Amino acid sequence: MHSSSSFIITSLEEEEKKPPAHHLHQQSIEDVGSVTSSATLLLLDSATWMMPSSTTQPHISEISGNECAACAQPILDRYVFTVLGKCWHQSCLRCCDCRAPMSMTCFSRDGLILCKTDFSRRYSQRCAGCDGKLEKEDLVRRARDKVFHIRCFQCSVCQRLLDTGDQLYIMEGNRFVCQSDFQTATKTSTPTSIHRPVSNGSECNSDVEEDNVDACDEVGLDDGEGDCGKDNSDDSNSAKRRGPRTTIKAKQLETLKNAFAATPKPTRHIREQLAAETGLNMRVIQVWFQNRRSKERRMKQLRFGGYRQSRRPRRDDIVDMFPNDQQFYPPPPPSNVQFFCDPYTTSPNNPETIQMAPQFAVPTENMNMVPEPYTEQSATPPEFNEDTFACIYSTDLGKPTPVSW
């Protein structure tokens, strides 16, 4: 036991000093480090007996004349009992609980004189596994600040007793998992097989970017409202691996809804309080809040216009929307017209590698056309008469009307 729970075995001696305190001899489990996922890895040492290290026989002195520590009367008896550096009458040295006389040994703690039975009832440690009493002849194992019976120190998954030299992992709630079960659970990544390991880091790390976790792939929640467990086809059901579904009762659901209305993204401390109040696992509560926030976002999108464009519009989309309006994009050039715009591939100073500058290529069907002969124009300028000068103006399509000035 720790120093805070130590007790003192005293005896009746003649004017001696306070004897040293005797501790229950217990073997601690040696902490050899930590492993992945921040789970604490422990190596079991050999178990020891749960019993006091030594006891002393009572010794009665024949010195009198001192005052009794119990009744404050002078001790005129032939024999005097000395306990904790104080003198006692033989009739005054009794257990504070059962009032039995202390004739052999006594136990003292917090200023109380107790017999062995009452001291065990008050201060003896109890097994953290079965909450049973630890007797002095019991073999025990210690993990952190907990003491276990040998029969109670077992893996919480396979129920195998952990022996000396075995490696184990301490999980949440002082549960122990053997190495093989921990590795199996880590590979399968099933959140309901074991809890997440205890981490020495800050608790706020679990509250950062919780929405990035795909909650639907890990735990299915069945609260009557969630859309997480609904799929559109049988292919999606076979493609996604789902964990066991958790049924949330009406009272638990009401508690979660009230907490969501107050804090849509609760901290770890609030989730722990909700877990204690509803009896649900913290992981289930975290996934429920994630699904609820996702549902609120979807409802808000549907309520305020809802459509969110997933890509930029293309030319075909615009043409389909306005089939009679081609002002957005001009029509493509004819297929018989080709444009060549080839840059220089090497230095232009080398005449062997110089290519032609960008030019317009004439269609092949027009290459054999004979140009018309050149005729010299007359040097006399043309004459115009204002009376015969007319402009064409028409109201009827296809019927020009001459207009004289």
From Swiss-Prot:
- Tissues in which the UniProt entry reports expression: Expressed in ADL, AVJL, AIZL, RICL, RIF and AVG neurons.
UniProt cross-references to PROSITE patterns, sorted A to Z: HOMEOBOX_1 (PS00027), HOMEOBOX_2 (PS50071), LIM_DOMAIN_1 (PS00478), LIM_DOMAIN_2 (PS50023)
Alphabetically sorted, this entry's keywords are: Developmental protein, DNA-binding, Homeobox, Isopeptide bond, LIM domain, Metal-binding, Nucleus, Repeat, Transcription, Transcription regulation, Ubl conjugation, Zinc
Q: Where is this region: Disordered?
A: 189-208, 224-246
Main location as per UniProt: nucleus
| Annotated Gene Ontology cellular component terms | nucleus
Tell me the DNA-binding residue spans.
241-300
Q: Which residues does the UniProt record annotate as the domain LIM zinc-binding?
A: 68-124, 127-187
Gene Ontology terms, MF aspect: DNA-binding transcription factor activity; DNA-binding transcription factor activity, RNA polymerase II-specific; RNA polymerase II transcription regulatory region sequence-specific DNA binding; zinc ion binding
Q: What is this protein called?
A: Protein lin-11
